[in-house]
């Protein structure tokens, strides 16, 4: 068992190593006991989020429907449509599904999205740009909340395994229906779907 002085020395060495690697800009890493975490959560009115709440958290996030563009809607509809039994999606297949929606709008003479959207024919024909766009937004919005992951080596996007396991077919259908309704409402002022 380490003495308090030994713990402090180890912590100082660890902080020096971390600082020398440029990982953190501060010299000390803050550590919180479970009771401190609970007190902070309570004082800031923060909810408890873990695997037991992930499905509820996901459904709440979908219900928020906070949109700048239609990207999150098309992304999630594509993910649900293409996911295999493990909740995994080949990113190349997702890119094709995603861009097809916007290209079809262009082909029909409809606005792709709001006026300041970067998606035009040239952009959508550049698969590298589309992939980069998907991974920065909308994917990142879902990843930040631990709902989806990206394996660059395998070229796969995946739902969080616990989330996927908890989603019944009825749940997936309900989310799909909501997203379609949100999409319909979103495009109402942009020439409809």
What are these regions (language model features)?
Residues 1-193:
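Intrinsically disordered, charged low-complexity linkers and terminal tails
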């Amino acid at each position: 068992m380490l003495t308090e002085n030994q713990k402090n020395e180890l912590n100082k060495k660890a902080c020096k190593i971390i600082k020398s690697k440029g990982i953190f800009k501060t010299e000390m890493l803050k550590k919180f006991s479970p009771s401190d975490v609970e007190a902070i959560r309570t004082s800031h009115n923060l909810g408890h989020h873990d695997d037991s709440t992930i499905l509820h958290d996901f459904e709440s996030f979908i219900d928020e429907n906070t949109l700048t563009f239609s990207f999150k809607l098309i992304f999630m509809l594509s993910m649900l449509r293409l996911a295999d039994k493990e909740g995994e999606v080949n990113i190349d297949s997702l890119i094709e599904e995603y861009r097809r929606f916007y290209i079809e709008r262009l082909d029909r003479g409809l606005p792709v999205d709001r006026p300041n959207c970067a998606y035009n024919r040239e952009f959508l024909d550049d698969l590298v740009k589309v992939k980069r766009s998907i991974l920065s937004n909308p994917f990142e919005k879902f990843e930040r909340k631990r709902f989806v992951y990206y394996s660059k080596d395998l070229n796969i996007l995946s739902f969080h395994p616990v989330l996927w396991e908890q989603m019944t077919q009825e749940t997936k259908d309900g989310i799909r229906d909501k997203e379609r309704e949100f999409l319909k409402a979103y495009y109402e002022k942009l020439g409809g779907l």
